[in-house]
Amino acid sequence: MPALRLLNTESQDKADYLHNQLTTDINVPSTYWECAESYLKGVGIYDVFLIEEQDFRNYKIFLHETGSFTKKQVFERTGFLRNLQKALIRNEYKELLDEIERCNTVQERLKGNVRNFLIRQGIHHVREIDYRTRELYESELRRTKTFSKSLEYLKTLDRIKQFDIRKEMETLSGRNKEQLKYEGQVIFLPYIPDQDIGSDFDYIQDKSELVWDFSQKASENLKRQIFQILCYALRNIKDSKDRRVRYLLPLRWMYEFCIEEGIDDIERLELEQIKKLETIVARKVVNVKNSMQIVDNSRKILFMSGKEIHWYANVWYMERFNFAPERVNPSNPVQRLSFYEVTNERNRELLQEYMKYQVGISDLALGNIRSQLCYIKKFLVYFNTIESICEITEEQIAEYFKLLQEQEIKAETVNRQIFDIHRFFAYLNVKGHIKGQIFDQNYYSQKVYPYHHDRSVQEDEYMEILKKLKFFPEVQRLIFLNLWATGLRISEVCTLKGDAYYWDGEDAWIKVYQIKMKAEKMIPISLVLYRIMKIYIKKHHIKSTDFLFNSKDGGAYRIGTFVKGFKASCKKYGIYISGETFKTHDYRHTLASSFYDDGVSIRTIRDYLGHNNENMTKQYIDYMPKRIEQANMEYFNQTENLLATGIIPKKRGEKTGK
């Protein structure tokens, strides 16, 4: 019974609301509104605002069919209802009508349909339009209009909304709302505050890809992460095509994948999950590698923007840290340290704890830390099935080291791996994760025998390069000249500064920081090289603290960039490179061997190259073949040592006497 009374009350309220609307103008004859009230109640309309064009026509037919009214009376009564609706709309929706009227980016003939729809939805201002409103309008248009007309009216709604956003952004209050805020809402990209970006999406035909639903049931942390990455892409990726192909589309696929898989943290994506996502992406695009960049890009955005360092993340990005200069090689920087390859979570946590110590507390160079991480990861992956690496036995470790020693790996590399693994266990021991040392590294280390590098570049090869060097790009030319003429390491050449070259009044010198040795040295150079580099420095207005050769991001020129570019130039100009590939270090060997052939002592060459000991220098010098050849020539140039000495030529047919 109470429910019935409630229903009756609601019905009466609606009837009263309609009655009040119809009797707004007291000067209108009661017969006008009484007739209209009776008809509207009969067809279930209790709000004058909701009367549509077809309703007006049906009312006109109804009046004719009663036979009680003349044509004039029918016209007057339908006119009353139309005029009443217009008056109510002008009074109730004045702001909305004015806002639509001000929009000068759409055709006037298309505004009416949009306006009527918004009024039926009870929308009083254009700013109230959101994606849900657009969705309702699209649904209505599909039912009532042709496909082409639907697109036309939807586009009109979008233009009205975008015009209003632009106008609002011109105000102080609007500019304060310029940044998107996470509110667990549905975001339609053409409606974002920054319309310079929003208008980029006008060309997208499938508007569904522009809808980002942060109201759906999913991990709140995941939704906030996706929102943050989305905002980053909108703000920082200026090329609209690149933004769509490398960020927005793959990000949407990753978002859908994470919801389906119940993933709540992108920074903790597992290797198997990444592979599964890659399989899904492969069904959507041809260039899978390009789209899968979203995983690394997303992790980096989140890691770099955290208020605190996310040590729990499966990938650490080194840009997040401020390292002492001597720990970084600007020409070959360590970009990231990854841990997701270790799928045993407990072992990964221990590895991350150890790497946190190495990165944050030790003074090791990042290149050494990366190398160490690589060796330990390989070790942990091998023992992935062990619940915790802390439970490993020496017998199991011995088995692993035996496998290492059976591979075609240099003894010093094997020893390096054993040493790094030993340091990892030493850390676990100090931190109380294990009790005592599990193995003795000296027991498993291999004996290292001195060996010689035969890596000198043949003269005809580098002379051909020098002959055609004028055709190479400027930076490639100058880097090669420094490699060939000075014997510097490629990392040292790529990190030369504007004050590297100087004249002491008698000789030209180059000052270089040895990244590998963490020391500065000076060596003499040719006057020609000095002059060439001084001209380059002056031409490009390079300051004393600036890098001579810059990468795209303004840092030191990348080693990989040079090698790749130089190889391409050699191929372009038909230059043959011996060996499997172009190796910059070979020119260091070449210069050292050249010095030795000219009679320079091993000690002097050692100092020039910047080695700590002569044994390393000896490995660089290809002295044996040339020394043997020279001794051979000297020996056989002596008449008594000629092989032909004592041989008496015989005439044809003459017996030998045997």
Label each residue range with its predicted role.
Residues 460-490, 588:
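Basic, Lys/Arg- and aromatic-enriched nucleic-acid-binding interface segment
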Residues 514-518, 609-637:
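Catalytic-site neighborhood detector that most strongly recognizes the C-terminal catalytic loop/helix
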